[in-house]
């Protein structure tokens, strides 16, 4: 039929099918037998019944049909056939449609011609025709299933029709053009479905359907947490475990969990099996008694989990212990930190009697042997309640172990905090006799020293862009970069102190707690942190592992060595933000800031300015008089500045500023006062300089009201300073009035200069003021 493509199924043949090749059934069977005896073949138009369909092998390329499997295989091996034009796979847009149904005709309730769906296959059919036709290695195996599948359609879109030239063959087609495509499913000699794009094999067609999605560019499964998209739902599930840290695949030998089954498989196939790793690792068991298992879990056994950490025996590593019931539900989770104790060290748990001394017995001998082996090996056992409740107190050391409901002995109990404290205390007693030749750090064993030395020679591809320090791992570089972060964004809720990271805040919050869970095993003194307890314990051992490279002095802490080295190098990294002074230690900087008078930034600046004073300050320091300058309200509110200079000390002067009746210390020269209101000289001003006495001050008050006139009354000894002050104040049209000292002369000398002219007008010959290029300059000339 036109506009629709045929759907037919040719089943795979086995040895039994070849044995029945001579069976005759109707007209089609006779024709098949004749073809077999003569070695010929049957053409496509030859009619055959549905029963003979199992005995016919059709070439998918040239559409030639064979009744003998050997002839069909020989035909495929020769590769001499050509594609039949009438049966060629479509090259129309229909070949690009998505395929998702495999349909086989079978006898159903509706009749023998009604098809049923047995599998779903979704593929991109763009290049399947060429890929399928060029697979002689798979086709030549003789086990072929040719399936022409159609795109998924609604029930009303499918109709039955007869193919041209084959009235007895039932075909299934779609009404719309471009809605189906031909796909051959090849089955290898093991009976597995073969993907024609990557040649992977699968057990069923449904698995092949799920696999074919990976060859598509569509990503319909999106993660709701981060927005990443994936082609398959399984990929999304595996990705989601990275957010939840779910590890459903657990090794039955060592208890280690993995996110993916492939990771567990690689773990089991590793060069060093996990059973060997247990002998060199630190183990700890967490057991749940039968009476403590929640309802619904198995009550016949005690659920135990053994966690081990592969690596150096003396290296402390965090271990996560999970207690699960029979269904795999997590009952309790304990975080501990274990370290292997040296030989001869006292065990942490009370000595347990041997198996023959146990008063109770159990039917399960294997379980008893397990408990006995665990106790003899020194493994700490902990019984944890099913709820997240506090641990029960441990039984006294002299008491015999009680029996559980199933007859097994009850496990001795220890709190996790007690385990950490005692292990850390006893680990601190181990002498460190193996120093590193490249740095000053020492180690207790040769194995830990070798592991440390590998860090010196390992490649360091991750380099800090700020200081150039290199690291072998990316997470070490990220942790190091916190040193260069000066911003402190994390605040302690108790005292308000700021820290760079939230981990520092958590460690600091122990200071506000009264709990001291880490006692010294030698003197019993308790500490809030394990590090403080370890540092204190070194005082009993007189151990100083950190040695100075300059003077060979030893220190118990690395920080003490760093502070000591600064005395050799002169480094002072702690700077005062006020005065810029550097200090070698942070505590010294804090004491500097907490001094009674505070940081003397202003006093130090005053001393520096007096060492190299300006010309105006020099003139002012040489004159013993006091000058009062009043700024007019034209610029701002009336402010009074008094600059005093004592006659005894002519080199240094103490400045006093009076602002609205309040007296404070200011700089010693008047230029800092004037420069705040005057920057540029303006045109159109008249300047009057007059030497007056104290009696003439009132007469000058009327002249001070003019905005374009500046009147200055000054003694003759301060003429040069007044000229400099006048040059600074001319641009604003400010009125300045200065009181003269008691030693001023009564004779007045007035000099008037127009700022628009460069011509100098002299009346007294003592002061010359010029205005070149619009900028007013005031110069004094001694006549």
Curated annotation (Swiss-Prot):
Residues 40-84 are annotated as: Required for ubiquitin ligase activity. Residues 574-596 are annotated as: Mediates interaction with RASSF1. A zinc finger (C2H2-type) spans 193-215, 221-243, 249-273, 434-456, 462-484, 490-512, 518-540, 546-568, 574-596. Residues 520-579 are annotated as: Mediates interaction with TP53. It comes from the Eukaryota. Phosphorylated; phosphorylation is cell cycle-dependent and regulates DNA-binding activity and function. May be sumoylated by UBE2I upon interaction with CDKN2A. The keyword Plastid does not apply. One of its GO terms (biological process) is regulation of DNA-templated transcription. One of its GO terms (cellular component) is spindle. The modification Phosphoserine is found at residue 49. Residues 368-565 are annotated as: Mediates interaction with CDKN2A. PROSITE patterns: ZINC_FINGER_C2H2_1, ZINC_FINGER_C2H2_2. Residues 386-407 are annotated as: Disordered. GO terms for molecular function: cAMP response element binding; DNA binding; DNA-binding transcription activator activity, RNA polymerase II-specific; DNA-binding transcription repressor activity, RNA polymerase II-specific; RNA polymerase II-specific DNA-binding transcription factor binding; transferase activity; zinc ion binding. Its main location: nucleus. Keywords: Cell cycle, Cell division, Cytoplasm, DNA-binding, Growth regulation, Metal-binding, Mitosis, Nucleus, Phosphoprotein, Repeat, Repressor, Transcription, Transcription regulation, Transferase, Ubl conjugation, Ubl conjugation pathway, Zinc, Zinc-finger. Disruption phenotype: Death before 7.5 dpc probably at the peri-implantation stage. Blastocysts display defects in mitotic progression and chromosomal segregation and increased apoptosis. Ubiquitously expressed. Residues 434-598 are annotated as: Interaction with BMI1. Homodimer; binds DNA as a dimer. Forms a complex with CDKN2A and TP53. Interacts with HDAC1, HMGA2 and RASSF1. Interactions with TP53, RB1, ANP32A and probably BMI1 and FHL2 regulate E4F1 activity. May function as a transcriptional repressor. May also function as a ubiquitin ligase mediating ubiquitination of chromatin-associated TP53. Functions in cell survival and proliferation through control of the cell cycle. Functions in the p53 and pRB tumor suppressor pathways and regulates the cyclin CCNA2 transcription. This is Transcription factor E4F1. It comes from Mus musculus (Mouse). The gene is E4f1.
């Amino acid at each position: 039929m036109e506009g629709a493509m045929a759907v037919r199924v040719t089943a795979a043949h086995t040895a039994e099918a070849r044995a029945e090749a001579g069976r005759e059934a109707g007209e089609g069977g006779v024709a098949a037998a004749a073809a077999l005896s003569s070695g010929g073949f049957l053409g496509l138009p030859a009619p055959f019944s549905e029963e003979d369909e199992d005995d016919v092998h059709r070439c998918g390329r040239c559409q030639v049909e064979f009744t003998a499997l050997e002839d069909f295989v020989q035909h495929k091996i020769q590769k001499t056939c050509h594609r039949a034009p009438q049966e060629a796979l479509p090259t129309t847009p229909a070949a690009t449609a998505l395929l998702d149904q495999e349909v086989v005709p079978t006898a159903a309730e509706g009749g023998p011609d009604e098809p049923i769906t047995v599998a779903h296959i979704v593929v991109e059919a763009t290049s399947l025709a060429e890929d399928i036709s060029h697979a002689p290695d798979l086709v030549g195996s003789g086990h072929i299933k040719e399936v022409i599948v159609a795109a998924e359609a609604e029930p009303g879109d499918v109709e039955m029709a007869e193919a041209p030239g084959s009235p007895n063959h039932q075909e299934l087609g779609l009404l719309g053009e471009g809605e189906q495509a031909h796909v051959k499913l090849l089955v290898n000699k093991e009976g597995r479905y073969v993907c024609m794009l990557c040649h992977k094999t699968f057990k069923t067609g449904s698995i092949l359907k799920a696999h074919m999605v990976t060859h598509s560019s569509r990503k319909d499964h999106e993660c709701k947490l981060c927005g990443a998209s994936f082609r398959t739902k399984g990929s999304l599930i595996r990705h989601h475990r990275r957010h939840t840290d779910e590890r459903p695949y657990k090794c039955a030998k060592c208890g280690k969990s993995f996110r993916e089954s492939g990771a567990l498989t690689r773990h089991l196939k590793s060069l060093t099996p996990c059973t060997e790793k247990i002998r060199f690792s630190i183990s700890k068991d967490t057991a749940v008694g039968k009476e403590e298992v929640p309802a619904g879990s198995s009550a016949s056994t005690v659920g135990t989990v053994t966690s081990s950490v592969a690596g150096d025996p003396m290296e402390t590593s965090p271990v996560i212990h999970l207690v699960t019931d029979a269904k795999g539900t997590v009952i309790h989770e304990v975080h501990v930190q274990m370290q292997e104790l040296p030989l001869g060290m006292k065990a942490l748990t009370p000595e347990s009697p041997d198996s023959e001394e146990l008063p109770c017995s159990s039917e399960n001998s294997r379980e008893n042997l397990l408990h006995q082996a665990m106790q003899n090996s020194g493994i700490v056992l902990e019984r944890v309640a099913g709820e997240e409740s506090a641990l029960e107190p441990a039984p006294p050391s002299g008491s015999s172990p009680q029996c559980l409901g199933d007859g097994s002995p009850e496990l001795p109990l220890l709190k996790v905090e007690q385990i950490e404290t005692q292990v850390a205390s006893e680990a601190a007693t181990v002498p460190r006799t193996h120093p590193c030749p490249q740095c000053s750090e020492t180690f207790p064993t040769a194995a830990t020293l070798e592991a440390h030395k590998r860090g010196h020679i390992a490649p360091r591809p991750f380099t800090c862009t700020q200081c150039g320090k290199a690291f072998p791992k990316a997470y070490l570089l990220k942790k190091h970069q916190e040193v260069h972060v000066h911003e402190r964004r994390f605040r302690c809720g108790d005292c308000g102190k700021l820290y760079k990271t939230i981990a520092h805040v958590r460690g600091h919050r122990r200071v506000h707690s009264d709990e001291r869970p880490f006692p010294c095993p030698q003197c019993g003194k308790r500490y809030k942190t394990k590090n403080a307890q370890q540092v204190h314990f070194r005082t009993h051992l007189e151990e100083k592992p950190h040695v100075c490279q300059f003077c060979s002095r030893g220190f118990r802490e690395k920080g003490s060595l760093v502070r000591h080295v600064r005395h050799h190098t002169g480094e002072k990294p702690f700077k005062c933000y006020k005065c810029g002074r550097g200090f070698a230690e942070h505590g010294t900087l804090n004491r500097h800031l907490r001094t009674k008078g505070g940081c003397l930034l202003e006093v130090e600046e005053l001393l520096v300015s007096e060492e190299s004073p300006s010309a105006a300050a020099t003139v002012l320091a040489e004159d013993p008089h006091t000058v009062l300058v009043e700024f007019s309200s034209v610029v701002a509110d009336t402010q009074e500045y008094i600059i005093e200079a004592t006659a005894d000390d002519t080199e240094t002067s103490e400045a006093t500023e009076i602002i609205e009746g309040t007296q404070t210390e200011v700089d010693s020269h008047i230029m800092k006062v004037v420069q705040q209101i005057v920057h540029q000289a303006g045109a159109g001003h008249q300047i009057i300089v007059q030497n007056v006495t104290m009696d003439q001050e009132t007469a000058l008050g009327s002249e001070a009201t003019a905005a374009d006139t500046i009147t200055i009354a000054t003694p003759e000894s301060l003429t040069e300073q007044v000229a400099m002050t006048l040059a600074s104040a001319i641009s604003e049209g400010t009125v300045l009035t200065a009181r003269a000292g008691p030693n001023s002369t009564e004779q007045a000398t007035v000099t008037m200069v127009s700022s628009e002219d460069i011509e100098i007008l002299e009346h007294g010959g003592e002061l010359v003021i010029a205005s070149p290029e619009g900028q007013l300059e005031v110069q004094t000339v001694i006549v």
